[in-house]
Amino acid sequence: MKKESNGTTIVKNFMKSQGSVFIILLVMCIIASIFTDKFLSVSNLSNVLAQSVTCGIAAIGMTFVILTGGIDLSVGGCIVFSATIGTKLLSEGKVGVGTAIIIMLLLGVLVGVFNGFLITVLKMPAFIATLASSNVTAGLALYISMGKTIIGLPLEYSFIGLKKIAGVPFCVLLMICLYIVAYIVLKYTGYGRKVYATGSNRKSAWLSGINVRLIEFSVYVIQGVMSALVGVVLTSKLLTCTRACLKNKNCTKRMFYFPFHDKIKKKGGSLC
């Protein structure tokens, strides 16, 4: 018998564990297409996916956090904080598009490091630490922007949020790539196994030689980067930066629903 390739094995394992989700999605699409003729059109599906990109990207980082038994309430603050500073520098012509994006992502790392420090070093409960972090970062963003909408962003900045490749929005392709990378990391790498172990039983993970504090610290950094990336996507779509738009409560709620899939709850830890 011929051995199956690694790629085939990965696809089969993925469908075995997540197949039910795709079946439900397929049924929903069929029902929607019965009532609306244009539901399955390329343009409509692209728009639907594009609308879910921001919550979807943030949910990637939240999945890592929840799997370790933590929670991160600083997502909204991190988004508006990183986006405000990056777009302000960009609108004033102090940096280019590429530099502005890098600055936003680094600010996301900074917020993640701050959260990780509060939780793993100062031993603060994740709920309290990240809630405080959210208020601090949102307040800083409000101070920096003086409560005003940041406009005058260059047109080339819109390529992340509005550009399409073969009819598919670039931001959708970016989200899909990030999901594939996250799935491979969690399923097939030592780091992913350590994340699961930390969430399942911290003491057992520590006794087995896993640096639990480092793993927990790292997932908040990942969440910070994902949050900052959401800020990039949102501001590149609108070519403006407003606090009300970036700190969308409905999106924040939906972002928490993404990781609370039954399999993630079973494999991850309890919320702190």
Protein language model features and the residues they cover:
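Hydrophobic alpha-helical transmembrane segments
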Residues: 18-23, 48, 56, 77-81, ...
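Alpha-helical transmembrane segments within multi-pass membrane transporters and channels
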Residues: 94-134, 177
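Single transmembrane alpha-helix segments in multi-pass membrane proteins
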Residues: 26-93, 117-123, 252, 258-266
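Membrane-helix/interface signature in polytopic inner-membrane proteins
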Residues: 181-221
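Transmembrane helix-bundle core of multi-pass membrane transporters
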Residues: 122, 126-189, 215-218, 234-246, ...
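Transmembrane alpha-helical segments of polytopic membrane transport and secretion proteins
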Residues: 1-20, 31, 40, 267-269
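Hydrophobic core segments of alpha-helical transmembrane domains in multi-pass membrane transport
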Residues: 21-33, 62-63, 134-139, 174-184, ...
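Inter-helical junctions in multi-pass inner-membrane proteins, predominant
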Residues: 37-47, 186, 192, 220-256, ...
